[in-house]
Design a protein with these regions (language model features):
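Internal, hydrophobic cores of structured domains that mediate oligomerization or house catalytic pockets
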Residues: 1-76
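Aromatic/basic-lined ligand-recognition segments
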Residues: 43-181
Length: 181
């Protein structure tokens, strides 16, 4: 026998992060009763339910889910895909609009750059979430010692980057390129 359960938040906290944390705790409890996976449809991603067991997260599991758990793991999904006729791999987030944040996309050389972009996107989303700062097309932000990300809107022929919220395309540039445009 198999079944699925749809979880949704019906509490009083207005913070999307707190709502996701509450749902993750329930998913962890359900994994003790045989739940196999947790799917976040708006983030286009899933994880094994066992990841959310309190034994896996440790003594401070709520703090871990709030502060240490990568947003791009489940709350804002990270997806890589190839587009026919285009060299390289597109990497992007989904679901950041649930937090009132933009999704980010980047055109990478290949799948081997996945961790780099996942880390950049996670760090920027976490910064925006915690600081309340806003980013838009035309903005730049330092993401490494000499590396900056420059943001732009998707081009008309980049229809595959459209989503329910704002998507900003990340182009990595070096420090000397910041004021060159």
């Amino acid at each position: 026998t198999s079944a699925n359960i749809i979880l949704y938040y019906k509490g009083y906290d207005t913070s999307p992060l707190e709502q996701y944390v509450a749902l993750a705790v329930v998913a962890g409890a359900l994994s003790n009763m045989g739940a196999v996976a947790v799917l976040n449809e708006s983030a286009h991603t899933s994880l094994p339910a066992g990841v959310f067991k309190s034994q896996e997260l440790g003594k401070h599991s709520l703090e871990m889910l709030r502060e240490g758990f990568p947003l791009t793991s489940l709350f804002c999904g990270f997806v890589k895909y190839e587009v026919e006729g285009i060299e390289g791999v597109w990497m992007r987030t989904y679901g950041a609009d649930c937090f009132g944040l933009p999704d980010f996309a980047a055109h990478a050389q290949g799948h081997h750059e996945g961790q780099k972009y996942s880390d950049i996107f996670n760090n920027v989303l976490r910064y925006l979430l915690e600081s309340g700062a806003e980013m838009a097309a035309g903005h730049t932000m330092q993401v490494g010692k000499t590396t900056f990300m420059k943001l732009r809107d998707p081009l008309d022929d980049e229809y595959y980057l459209q989503g329910p919220g704002t998507t900003l395309v990340v182009e990595l540039i070096e420090e000397d390129e910041c004021n060159a445009h």
